[in-house]
């Protein structure tokens, strides 16, 4: 398991401790694919509600770092590297999608279903994404997933924890490029996409105040103006905008929700870390489809992960 400093543990407690006298609603958002040259942008999102920290509530069922025996929820950049990385992502992603939806997605297409499902027409404009009815799981035995689910459900019941939402918003390359052109730059388009996802999380019914944490988007520090433009109905009020955290209080239909953009958000929020896992899992499955499409037509071509230098090699 990755070691954490005393400061990290203290910050995690301050950031994720229960709200006084209320059940704790925690939402989180993270992305995979904003920097690479090839493949989709995937935005993972999750929300949980209960009286305490989900990492503590699920400590016997879910690990906080890579584990041989349990599914893990942590930064995907920690969980994915090394042999079996996609299997580790799959084990955790399918567990929480099952907890949120009541059923496990059976195909890649079902994995992408939800409030931000890409339309079939959008996917069909990308021929490498037409074959998304491949069965899931790909890497983890069904029996192991069922055992994980039974263990996690028991832990949730004992702790009074509910997985309110879990999903992925996938933006294929053509949609991404068109959006960047409309917005004028990648950063503004990205903020617009994230704003729509956080609006969904912020307006989920909840029993009290809530907290939504987004892993900070690049080097951006000030979100007040774009949030006011994109979500005027929430009247976002800045609470702090410093190098480590930008925090806003939301009003209107999201009244009582506190929104934070944080450096290293996956260390501070279970929901944000889960968003990271969901986004990375979906992106890797879709990049695998992209590779399969082109390798079938160009024998000898080496697969790509989509990052800039290797993506250019793939395109040559």
Show the residue positions of the predicted features.
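RNase H-like, Mg2+-dependent phosphodiesterase core
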Residues: 1-316
């Amino acid at each position: 398991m990755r070691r954490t400093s005393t400061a990290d543990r203290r910050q995690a407690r301050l950031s994720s401790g229960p709200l006084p006298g209320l059940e704790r609603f925690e939402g989180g958002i993270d992305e995979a694919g904003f920097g690479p040259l090839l493949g989709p942008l995937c935005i993972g999102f999750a929300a949980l509600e209960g009286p305490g920290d989900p990492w503590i509530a699920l400590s016997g069922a879910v690990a906080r770092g890579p584990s041989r025996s349990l599914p893990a929820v942590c930064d995907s950049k920690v969980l994915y590297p090394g042999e079996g990385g996609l299997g580790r992502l799959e084990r955790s992603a399918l567990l929480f999608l099952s907890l949120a939806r009541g059923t496990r997605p059976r195909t890649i297409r079902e994995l992408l279903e939800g409030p931000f499902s890409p339309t079939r027409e959008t996917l069909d404009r990308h021929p490498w994404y037409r074959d998304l009815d491949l069965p899931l799981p790909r890497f983890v035995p069904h029996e192991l997933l069922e055992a994980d689910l039974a263990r996690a459900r028991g832990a949730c019941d004992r702790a009074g924890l509910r997985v309110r939402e879990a999903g992925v918003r996938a933006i294929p390359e053509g949609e991404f490029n068109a959006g960047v052109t409309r917005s004028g730059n990648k950063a503004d388009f990205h903020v617009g996409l994230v704003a729509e996802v956080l609006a969904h999380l912020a307006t989920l019914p909840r029993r009290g105040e809530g907290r939504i944490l987004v892993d900070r988007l690049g080097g951006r520090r000030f979100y007040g103006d774009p949030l006011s433009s994109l979500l005027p109905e929430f009247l976002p009020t800045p609470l702090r905008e410093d190098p480590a955290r930008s925090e806003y209080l939301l009003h209107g239909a999201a009244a009582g929700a506190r929104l934070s953009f944080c450096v290293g958000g996956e260390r501070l929020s279970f929901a944000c870390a889960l968003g990271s896992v969901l986004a990375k899992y979906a992106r890797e499955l879709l990049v695998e489809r992209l590779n399969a499409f082109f390798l079938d037509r160009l024998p000898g071509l080496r697969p790509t992960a989509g990052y800039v230098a290797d993506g250019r090699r793939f395109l040559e």
